[in-house]
């Protein structure tokens, strides 16, 4: 594409391409907290200065799945500052926007909204950091989309089949088919490609007249047999692929000789890990497209914090370092000090004339101390550079290469993976879980749960703060195994049950689709549980709080009028009774007061424990419960089980006193001969101190306690 063609704006699309901005990364750090916001400001300023038609983002606009208010506020502030205005948009949308943006409440491009004044549209897919989660499957990009600042596209609504429908753009005689695919777990997407479940739809008319641009956010480098997306999986009619997620900047388009399309990897806009791939200079791209021709102009970012990295191997310097020398540690420190000073001098030299670049650089010196050397204290050494570098705590990284042993089986060298990360990537949580169980001894292997399910549950817990993910996965797989055993009618022998559990687990592992369904169902349960807890937490209104305060005040008045006794007894005589002759009720149930039609709901701190213990029984207990008929002995046993869970010696210290009302009831009832079931129920009454905290205690009960 010639220079004259590139400057012909009438028929030329000008697109600013960026990816992996990671807004909010280390926002609480005193030195690096504003780095991502400053870089986004520079990117948007470049877009406005070059008068681009639109901005194209390749995912991970946010670093956290639930960005902070500061991060969201700053992002909206910058988008409003640079992307709104009176400059007209020169291209039009030809495709059905209800299909392209069908998951949005406003299924049309933002610059065509009559209530908004957009001068630079932003099109973005979601990445693995800011992907949709929760019961409603929302992400931070949906907030920006609802506010009218970002056009979120490339979202797949199905986990079984993906149809990628392009956004069709036209400017003059140039037509672009913009395809997008937001981040999907690599193994799942790999399997869908293999099973031909991914389809890229093409325009029906004049297929060859469209420039096909595809934006994807997946692993490009190989992390495992299926934990990446090979370039050969993509359709060969594509002209250019914008590949997000990989942080090393390889923005110059490279040709895939097999598929004959070009791939541009813009890389991250900020340093998020001290790895070799991040040390490459950061750029964004100004993509010009006219007809079927393109040109990618690299634009360096001047506000990115400098990052210098160097490796040294102590064993390669036998003339300087001798592990038998008692002063070898001092020699190593002096050598490292010299290397770091050299990197700081290079940083100062490169920063000359660029006042927009942060003053303190990132420095990482990796030291291989193989060969009998010992590492020194990094914390003490780094004190010398606190005021000169942005990362003094991890300025030096010690590692060593272990000798390769004869492999008796498949083993994972974690030291090699950690000390030599591949091209700017880091290990993922689910990979570590899988690798751990692959190399673990037999006695610590999972026998009921699956490694893949546990890996994804841990990932949801760590990356997306789904606190119930692990618990719900365990419950779901346990329930499914219990149902399987009940349907098989196996004898209640431990050996046979273990064998059936092992066979059932192996069959599930072979059926990957079934395992996917299990994980999805467990994650859906966890998200629904979180949504319910959030709704219940916000259900109390001001009137509820006032009623709680009133109940507490009345209960406090009752306690003040009745002197407390020093009796520490438990069981009979403890808790609210509401008068003599009242029927006892088990904890967590309801009790009916004398001469009243009102039911008072009773609560206990231990009620949840009792219910949970009875519900989450073991496999053998669950199996036995279906084989035995209920009897009186079974009922008595159930009471003893609840007592065993609820009772604890610590309760005596928590509730050391009882009121005179309790003593009066106790003295009256002690003369009676109580049955075993009555004794079991007696321990379930709440103490008077629980009344102070119970906002649902009715007024009649409070009055009886006063009398």
From Swiss-Prot:
Disordered: annotated span: 505-540, 556-707
Biased composition (Acidic residues): 643-654, 686-695
SUPFAM superfamilies referenced in this protein's UniProt entry, alphabetically: Metallo-dependent phosphatases
Gene Ontology CC terms, in alphabetical order: chromosome, telomeric region; Mre11 complex; replication fork; site of double-strand break
Modification N-acetylserine occurs at: 2
Modified residues (Phosphoserine): 2, 275, 618, 640, 648, 675, 677, 687-688, 700
One of the record's GO molecular function terms: 3'-5' exonuclease activity
One Pfam family in the UniProt entry: Metallophos
Subcellular location: Nucleus; Chromosome; Chromosome, Telomere
Region annotated Interaction with NBN, chain positions: 87-117
Main subcellular localisation: nucleus
UniProt cross-link Glycyl lysine isopeptide (Lys-Gly) (interchain with G-Cter in SUMO), position: 384, 467
Regulation: Interaction with SAMHD1 stimulates the double-strand-specific 3'-5' exonuclease activity. RBBP8/CtIP specifically promotes the endonuclease activity to clear protein-DNA adducts and generate clean double-strand break ends. DYNLL1-binding inhibits the activity of MRE11. MRE11 activity is inhibited by C1QBP: in absence of DNA damage, C1QBP interacts with unphosphorylated MRE11, preventing formation and activity of the MRN complex.
Active site: 129 (proton donor)
Keywords per UniProt: Acetylation, Chromosome, DNA damage, DNA repair, Endonuclease, Exonuclease, Hydrolase, Isopeptide bond, Manganese, Meiosis, Metal-binding, Methylation, Nuclease, Nucleus, Phosphoprotein, Telomere, Ubl conjugation
Quaternary context: Component of the MRN complex composed of two heterodimers RAD50 and MRE11 associated with a single NBN. The MRN complexes dimerize on DNA to form joined MRN-MRN oligomers required for DNA double-strand break repair. As part of the MRN complex, interacts with MCM9; the interaction recruits the complex to DNA repair sites. Component of the BASC complex, at least composed of BRCA1, MSH2, MSH6, MLH1, ATM, BLM, RAD50, MRE11 and NBN. Found in a complex with TERF2. Interacts with DCLRE1C/Artemis and DCLRE1B/Apollo. Interacts with ATF2. Interacts with EXD2. Interacts with MRNIP.
NCBIfam families: mre11
UniProt record similarity statement: Belongs to the MRE11/RAD32 family.
Name this polypeptide is given: Double-strand break repair protein MRE11
Species, as recorded: Macaca fascicularis
Gene for this chain: MRE11
């Amino acid at each position: 594409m010639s220079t004259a063609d590139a400057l012909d704006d009438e028929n030329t699309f000008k697109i600013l391409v960026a990816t992996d901005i990671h807004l909010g990364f280390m926002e609480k750090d005193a030195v690096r907290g504003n780095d991502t916001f400053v870089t986004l400001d520079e990117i948007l300023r470049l877009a406005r200065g070059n008068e681009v038609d639109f901005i194209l983002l390749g995912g991970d606009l946010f670093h956290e799945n639930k960005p902070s208010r500061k991060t969201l506020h700053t992002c909206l502030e910058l988008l409003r500052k640079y992307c709104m205005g009176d400059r007209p948009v020169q291209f039009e949308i030809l495709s059905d926007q209800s299909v392209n943006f069908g998951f949005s409440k406003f299924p049309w491009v933002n610059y065509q909204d009559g209530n908004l004044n957009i001068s630079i549209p932003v099109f973005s897919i979601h990445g693995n950091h800011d992907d949709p989660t929760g019961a409603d499957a929302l992400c931070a990009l949906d907030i920006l989309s609802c506010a009218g600042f970002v056009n979120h596209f490339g979202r797949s609504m199905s986990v079984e089949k993906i149809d990628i429908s392009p956004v069709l753009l036209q400017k003059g005689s140039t037509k672009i088919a913009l395809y997008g695919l937001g981040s999907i777990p690599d193994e799942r997407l790999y399997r869908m490609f293999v099973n031909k479940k991914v389809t890229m739809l093409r325009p029906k008319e004049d297929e060859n007249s469209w420039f096909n641009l595809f934006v994807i956010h997946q692993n490009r480098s190989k992390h495992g047999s299926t934990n990446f997306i090979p370039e050969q999986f993509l359709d060969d009619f594509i002209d250019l692929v914008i590949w997000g997620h990989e942080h090393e900047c390889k923005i110059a388009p490279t040709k895939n000789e097999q598929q004959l399309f070009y791939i541009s990897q813009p890389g991250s806009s900020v340093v998020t890990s001290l790895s070799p791939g991040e040390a490459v200079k950061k750029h964004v791209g100004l993509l010009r497209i006219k007809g079927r021709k393109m040109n990618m102009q690299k634009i360096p970012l001047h506000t990115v914090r400098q990052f210098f990295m160097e490796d040294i191997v102590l064993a390669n310097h036998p003339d300087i370092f001798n592990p038998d020398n008692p002063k070898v540690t001092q020699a190593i420190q002096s050598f490292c000090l010299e290397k770091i000073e050299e990197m700081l001098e290079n940083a100062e030299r490169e920063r000359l004339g660029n006042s927009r670049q942060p003053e303190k650089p990132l420095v990482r010196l990796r030291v291989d101390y193989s060969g009998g050397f010992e590492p020194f204290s990094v914390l003490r050494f780094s004190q010398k550079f606190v005021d000169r570098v942005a990362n003094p705590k991890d300025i030096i990284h010690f590692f060593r290469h272990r000798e390769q042993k004869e492999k008796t089986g498949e083993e994972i060298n974690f030291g090699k993976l950690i000390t030599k990360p591949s091209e700017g990537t880091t290990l993922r949580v689910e990979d570590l879980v899988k690798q751990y169980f692959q190399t673990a001894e037999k006695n610590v292997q999972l026998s009921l749960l699956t490694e893949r399910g546990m890996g994804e549950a841990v990932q949801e817990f760590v990356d997306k703060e789904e606190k119930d993910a692990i618990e719900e996965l365990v419950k779901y797989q346990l329930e499914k195994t219990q149902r399987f055993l009940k349907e098989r009618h196996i004898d209640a022998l431990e050996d046979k049950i273990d064998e059936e559990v092992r066979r059932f687990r192996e069959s599930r592992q072979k059926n990957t689709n079934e395992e996917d369904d299990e994980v999805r169902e467990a994650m859906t349960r966890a998200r629904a549980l979180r949504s319910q807890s959030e709704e219940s937490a916000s259900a109390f209104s001001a009137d509820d709080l006032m009623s709680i305060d009133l109940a507490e005040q009345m209960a406090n008045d009752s306690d003040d009028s009745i002197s407390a006794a020093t009796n520490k007894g438990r069981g009979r005589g403890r808790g609210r009774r509401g008068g003599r002759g009242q029927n006892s009720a088990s904890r967590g149930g309801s009790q009916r007061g004398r001469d009243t039609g009102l039911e008072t709901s009773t609560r206990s701190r231990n009620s949840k424990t009792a219910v949970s213990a009875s519900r989450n029984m073991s496999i053998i207990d669950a199996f036995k419960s279906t084989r035995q008929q209920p009897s009186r002995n079974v009922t008595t046993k159930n009471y003893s089980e609840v007592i065993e869970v609820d009772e604890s010696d610590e309760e005596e210290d928590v509730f050391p006193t009882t009121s005179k009302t309790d003593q009066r009831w106790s003295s009256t009832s002690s003369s009676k001969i109580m049955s075993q079931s009555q004794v079991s129920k007696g321990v379930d009454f709440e103490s008077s101190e629980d009344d102070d905290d119970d906002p649902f205690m009715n007024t009649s009960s409070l009055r009886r306690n006063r009398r």
